[in-house]
Amino acid sequence: MSSSVDVDIYDAVRAFLLRHYYNKRFIVYGRSNAILHNIYRLFTRCAVIPFDDIVRTMPNESRVKQWVMDTLNGIMMNERDVSVSVGTGILFMEMFFDYNKNSINNQLMYDIINSVSIILANERYRSAFNDDGIYIRRNMINKLYGYASLTTIGTIAGGVCYYLLMHLVSLYK
């Protein structure tokens, strides 16, 4: 069973996690930027994470990546609401970064960030990022601009035709 990964969600989640880990701004454009802003709204609906209990089970650095993936999947599978599970998963990652800021090497953290971004970009979690509303608004605005430009072009073309017709009528009078 294969599932697709939404590249825009992947970019947005990766930029969000990199922002938190490196404490720097990472800029994304287009749909990814809108999704990135929607990620901040997910924190209003998060479950409580018993982080101290979870961290006690953390293995050494050689197996920490698999532990993060297993823990994240466990946290996210316990929730029925997709928004709550994604928000809780991202909150767990922030806590994990804060706890392990200087204890795990950067390359391993970067691999973990990429893996988590792939998990969250899965089509199963797409509805949590609420990007469908962006498409609907964009399509409505594009149609409105299309109709407005078509109406404007039609009005100008009609005016030119009317002028030419009146000019021809005045020539043959």
Curated annotation (Swiss-Prot):
Stored InterPro entries: Vaccinia_virus_B6 (IPR009974)
Record key words, sorted: Early protein
Induction text: Expressed in the early phase of the viral replicative cycle.
Tree of life domain: Viruses
One protein family per Pfam: Pox_B6
Sequence similarity: Belongs to the orthopoxvirus OPG191 protein family.
Name the record gives this protein: Protein OPG191
